[in-house]
């Protein structure tokens, strides 16, 4: 498939994990690097369709901000694939913790290695089935899991010692969460439950790029940095203000605009 066609397919993709989309897009952008005038519109098209996908913003910034776009795309893909955040999260969880969290690949990978923990996971039926299968395939059997629908925040947080959420994207002023994750965070705050933000490779952007995301869709909300207890990322746990100010990608002028898509 020609890289332009591959990128169009990625742009049209529905509700798919943004890290997976960025890895797929990196391959196509690396091939497209020989046509430099096509790179900017290709990146903008991706972001018009997935304007809250932190890893895609991060990838496009790496590619457009590099004198060697092909090498930058390949290096970015490798970083996304080798992201150690799940392992860092697994190592940070307190012993026998009761963890509440929306379903996400990073959280499930971490829980797969912690059979001493208990998990209250939130998601639609298909997502919950996938999560149960993923966690159960851990070498040690994984955490014990109970599944809940998105409309049950009080039940999810009952008895929980820790709430873990993964943002669409984050930056210096906070993190953009799905509506259901934001509802959980609000209920958890009222109940005094500690909140950890899991922000893997590509999820934290510098202020100029994060500003482009703040017009987000009606189904997403901003979680303020002061409402976060800790951020778990590729380097392990970090104080929230420091972690969310650590977006270290270029801010190419070609991305200094606000996408209108959703």
Positions of predicted regions on the chain:
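A short, well-structured juxtamembrane/interface segment
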Residues: 77-95, 103-109
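Small/polar-residue-rich loop-to-helix segments that shape phosphate-bearing ligand pockets
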Residues: 66-83, 136
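Glycine-rich phosphate/diphosphate-binding loops that line cofactor/substrate pockets in enzymes
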Residues: 88-98, 114, 159
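Long amphipathic alpha-helical segments
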Residues: 1-74
């Amino acid at each position: 498939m020609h890289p332009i066609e591959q990128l169009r397919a990625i742009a049209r993709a529905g509700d798919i994990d943004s890290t997976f989309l960025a890895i797929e897009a990196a391959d196509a952008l690396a091939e497209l690097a020989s046509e430099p005038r096509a790179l900017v519109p290709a990146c903008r098209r991706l972001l018009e369709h997935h304007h809250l996908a932190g890893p895609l913003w991060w990838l496009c910034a790496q590619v457009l901000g590099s004198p060697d776009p092909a090498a930058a795309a390949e290096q970015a893909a490798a970083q996304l694939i080798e992201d150690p955040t799940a392992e860092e999260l697994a190592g940070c969880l307190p012993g026998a913790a009761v963890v509440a969290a929306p379903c996400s690949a990073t959280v499930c990978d971490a829980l797969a290695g912690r059979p001493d923990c208990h998990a209250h996971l939130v998601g639609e039926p298909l997502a919950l089935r996938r999560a149960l299968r993923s966690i159960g395939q851990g070498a040690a059997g994984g955490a014990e899991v109970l599944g809940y629908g998105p409309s049950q925040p009080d039940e999810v947080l009952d008895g929980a010692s820790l709430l873990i959420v993964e943002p669409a994207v984050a930056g210096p002023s906070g993190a953009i969460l799905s509506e259901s994750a934001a509802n959980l965070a609000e209920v958890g705050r009222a109940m005094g439950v500690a909140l950890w933000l899991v922000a893997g490779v590509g999820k934290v952007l510098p202020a100029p790029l994060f500003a482009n995301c703040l017009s987000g869709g009606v189904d997403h909300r901003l979680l303020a940095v002061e409402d976060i207890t800790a951020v778990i990322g590729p380097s392990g746990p970090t104080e929230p203000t420091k972690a969310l100010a650590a977006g270290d990608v270029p801010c190419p002028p070609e991305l200094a605009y606000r996408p209108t898509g959703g």
